[in-house]
From Swiss-Prot:
Note: Eleven additional peptides containing a similar cysteine pattern are predicted from this sequence. However, there is only tentative evidence.
Organism placement in taxonomy: Eukaryota, Viridiplantae, Streptophyta, Embryophyta, Tracheophyta
Record keywords: Antimicrobial, Disulfide bond, Fungicide, Plant defense, Secreted, Signal
Name recorded for this polypeptide: Antimicrobial peptide X precursor
Chief location of this protein within or outside the cell: secreted
GO (cellular component) term, any one: extracellular region
Keyword Signal included in the entry's annotation: yes
Role: The mature peptide has antifungal activity against germinated and ungerminated spores of A.alternata (IC(50)=7.4 uM and IC(50)=12.5 uM, respectively), A.niger (IC(50)=2.8 uM and IC(50)=4.0 uM, respectively), B.cinerea (IC(50)=9.3 uM and IC(50)=16.2 uM, respectively), F.oxysporum (IC(50)=8.0 uM and IC(50)=5.4 uM, respectively) and F.solani (IC(50)=8.0 uM and IC(50)=7.2 uM, respectively). Has no activity against B.sorokiniana, P.infestans and P.ultimum. Has no antibacterial activity towards C.michiganensis, E.carotovora, E.coli and P.syringae at concentrations up to 40 uM.
Coiled coil location: none
Record has Signal as a keyword: yes
Localization: Secreted
Species the sequence originates in: Stellaria media
Tissue expression remark: Expressed in seeds (at protein level). Expressed in flowers but not in leaves, stem or roots.
GO aspect biological process, one term: defense response to fungus
Free-text comment about domains: The presence of two CXXXC motifs with connectivity I-IV, II-III structurally identifies this peptide as an alpha-hairpinin.
Length: 478
């Protein structure tokens, strides 16, 4: 009986200690749950949230699994549970309850100084190198002066300082936002999320893929936003790609720019007319037609008139018609009336040939059959006028304008008299060099001179032409 009180005492002590342990474990589990809840409701980045949860398990007990890892901002692989002293120090800085990002950075800097971890690619982002310091100054300036465009501004800072460490992903974007002051941190993070969502599922043009290789999706998005790759420009680009095949991107760019100006300058009626007239032909036909039909009243009237006259005869007929009509005021009225009378019932081509004086003896005899000697003399006189042309007109112009009449010779002569010194004085050096290169294959010094002169006056637009005859055709259009 004497041992019974002792047994009861031991049993009560055992039960009390067991209950105390159970209560203690329940308290720790409750505290662990509260700690994890605090981590979940805070606006931490994914890696900081994992660090916070990991600290909860260390402080209040729990499993140690790969679920709770610390990911360094710059590490390519996550750090598992085993932490070095430097990483442990840094982890405590990040899981600090104060929530101050600036204080966390100061804490991490002290960790780096204390443990001297030189292998970490991490946080001392405020690095010892001058380049890094300049980048940080640039970044801080972005945050102060360009809060709405700070991502784009930071990209420029990175480019200027050669900052090329990894893709500029959402995590990096979010991390940059952590240093934002004056309550705009959440707005900055929202922009990061929006940047990421906007990019999802959107096709990226090959040009932007190549340009942003290794740069991440924000670079691609900015490239796509600033490119000319909308629906209309893609259509133009396909046409220009075909027209500029083998001539490089500069040709395409100029082609697209010229097309854009054509679209803005041309009347809808003229545009439809050119599309109809050039149906089934190359895009160059439509572009030339649009250029011919200037957006002034006279140009439209001439174009519509020539369209009627040249129905079924193609674009070359209309081009010649417009050229002749434009030079009608300079032609001898007597010749014009004679040609109209002589070619009555024979169509526009006959009248055109007559106005240009491109007939030989046999042609004159045929055209003037039954119309008297005056007709034949007038026809022959026009024929001789081309042969007895002004001696001041170069042989090169006579050769180019053979069969084209006096209007062509006069324009060619004017082009020859262009003062190269005055022309080159106002010409961009790149355009001048380009024109010299483009006209290098033109035979003859005078021909090359005219080619360069026309090219420079056209500000290099002559790049789409390849022969001297096309150069002069462009000259005649002036």
């Amino acid at each position: 009986m004497g041992k019974l009180p002792l047994l009861l005492l031991l049993l009560s002590v055992f039960l009390t200690s067991t209950l105390a342990l159970r209560l203690s474990n329940e308290d720790r589990q409750q505290e662990l749950g509260q700690c994890l809840h605090r981590c979940d409701i805070r606006r931490y980045s994914p890696d900081m949230q994992r660090a916070c949860r990991h600290k909860c398990h260390m402080d209040f007990g729990g499993r140690k699994s790969d679920e709770f890892v610390v990911v360094d901002y710059h590490y390519e692989e996550p750090e598992l549970f085993s932490l070095s002293p430097y990483q442990m120090c840094k982890f405590h800085c990040r899981a600090d309850d104060s929530g101050s990002f600036g204080r966390m950075l100061e804490c991490e800097k002290k960790c780096a100084e204390e443990y001297g971890n030189e292998n970490s690619r991490n946080v001392d982002e405020r690095s010892p190198s001058d380049s890094r310091k300049r980048f940080e100054e640039c970044r801080r300036k972005c945050q102060k002066t360009h809060p709405d465009k700070q991502l784009e501004c930071i990209r420029k800072c990175q480019k200027a300082q050669g900052e090329r460490k990894g893709d500029y992903t959402f995590e990096v974007c979010e991390r940059r936002c952590q240093d934002t002051r004056h309550g705009s941190k959440l707005a900055c993070i929202d922009r990061c999320v929006k940047e990421g969502r906007d990019n999802e599922g959107r096709p990226v043009s090959p040009k932007c893929q190549k340009k942003c290789e290794g740069e991440g999706y924000i670079c691609q998005r900015m490239c796509m936003k600033g490119s000319d790759d909308d629906t209309q420009d893609r259509q133009v680009s396909l046409k220009c790609q075909k027209m500029c095949e083998g001539k490089g991107y500069d040709c395409q760019k100029r082609c697209m720019r010229m097309d854009q100006s054509d679209d803005n300058d041309q009347d809808t009626q003229v545009s439809k007319m050119c599309q109809k007239m050039c149906q089934g032909k190359s895009y160059e036909c439509q572009r030339k037609c649009m250029k011919e039909c200037d957006d002034d009243t006279q140009g439209r009237q001439v174009s519509l008139k020539c369209q009627r006259m040249c129905r079924g005869e193609g674009y070359d007929c209309q081009k010649k018609c417009m050229r002749i009509d434009q030079s009608d005021d300079n032609e001898d009225p007597q010749i014009s009336k004679m040609c109209q009378k002589m070619c009555q019932g024979k169509g526009y081509v006959c009248e055109s040939m007559c106005m240009k004086g491109g007939h030989d003896d046999t042609q004159c005899q045929k055209m003037c059959q039954g119309k008297g000697d005056d007709c034949q003399k007038m026809c022959m006189g026009m024929d001789q006028s081309d042969k007895n042309e002004d001696p001041q007109v170069s042989q090169m112009c006579q050769q180019i304008c053979q069969g084209e009449g006096r209007g062509c010779l006069q324009r060619c002569k004017r082009a020859e008299k262009v003062d190269d010194a005055n022309t080159e004085m106002n010409v961009d050096p790149d355009v001048r060099a380009y024109c010299k290169h483009q006209c290098m294959s033109t035979r003859g010094d005078q021909a090359r001179k005219i080619c360069e002169s026309v090219c420079m006056r056209q500000d290099g637009k002559i790049m789409l032409l390849s022969t001297i005859s096309e150069v002069v055709a462009r000259l005649l259009d002036d």
